[in-house]
């Protein structure tokens, strides 16, 4: 697929930027979003923290408000209240306060060591997954997204590809059309009666 080729370095930066730009000129369809999601999940480094029944609290980013990272702050609050949280995020592509920027400033050392994440869950009720460590395609597009400095369809994909596949998710979006798109996407992915995943 396209994302697998990106992950394997088969396209140069100009070609990848061109692909991203296509979806700035027209809206992405549900089918395209689901296809990209499937490809990213297929390439992910899987992480099993299901014993904690965690929630992911995440926003798409790209709202242009330049606020502090509210979803990451909410993760700390929820974890402090005793609810297990598995946060999946990245450096800001359109802002200075992506989840990874916030975590790094708080001294978090990014890791893909599942045992270390499990210890973090046991001690603090929270584990952080820095997206590029868990998906080669997200790592490959990161500098291109930063260079474009505009909201792209990767803002939409990020919240859908947490490698833990958490049981619950609280998701913030930047506009009503995107909320509707996510609603259709979640309905497609809840045909197995896993109703928690539809609580967008």
Model region roles, listed by residue range:
Residues 105-120:
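A glycine-rich helix N-cap at a beta->alpha junction
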Residues 19, 103, 158:
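Residue-level signal for inorganic ion chemistry
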Residues 1-67, 81:
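Acidic, glycine/proline-rich low-complexity segments that act as flexible tails and inter-domain linkers
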Residues 171-185:
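Gly/Ser/Thr-rich active-site loops/lids in small-molecule metabolic enzymes
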Residues 54-96, 154-155, 161:
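Glycine/serine-rich anion-binding loops at beta->alpha junctions
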Residues 116-172:
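Phosphate/diphosphate-binding glycine-rich loops and adjacent basic-rich segments that engage nucleotide
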Residues 92-108:
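Active-site-proximal loop->helix
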Residues 189-196:
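Conserved small/polar residues in nucleotide/adenosyl-binding loops
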């Amino acid at each position: 697929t396209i994302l697998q080729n990106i992950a394997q370095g088969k396209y140069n930066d100009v070609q990848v930027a061109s692909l991203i730009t296509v979806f700035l000129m027209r809206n992405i369809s549900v089918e395209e979003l689901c296809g990209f999601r499937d490809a990213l999940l297929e390439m992910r480094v899987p992480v099993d923290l299901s014993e904690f029944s965690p929630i992911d609290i995440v926003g798409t980013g790209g709202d242009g408000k330049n606020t502090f990272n509210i979803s990451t702050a909410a993760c700390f609050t929820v974890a402090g209240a005793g609810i297990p949280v598995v946060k999946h995020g990245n450096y800001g592509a359109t802002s200075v306060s992506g989840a990874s920027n916030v975590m790094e400033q708080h001294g978090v050392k990014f890791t893909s060591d599942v045992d270390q994440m499990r210890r973090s869950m046991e001690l603090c009720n929270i584990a952080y997954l820095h997206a590029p460590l868990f998906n080669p395609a997200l790592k490959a597009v990161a500098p291109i997204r930063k260079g474009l400095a505009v909201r792209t369809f990767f803002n939409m994909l990020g919240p859908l590809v947490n490698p833990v596949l958490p049981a619950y998710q609280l998701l913030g979006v930047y506009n009503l059309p995107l909320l509707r798109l996510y609603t259709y996407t979640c309905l497609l992915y809840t045909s197995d009666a896993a109703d928690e995943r539809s609580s967008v």
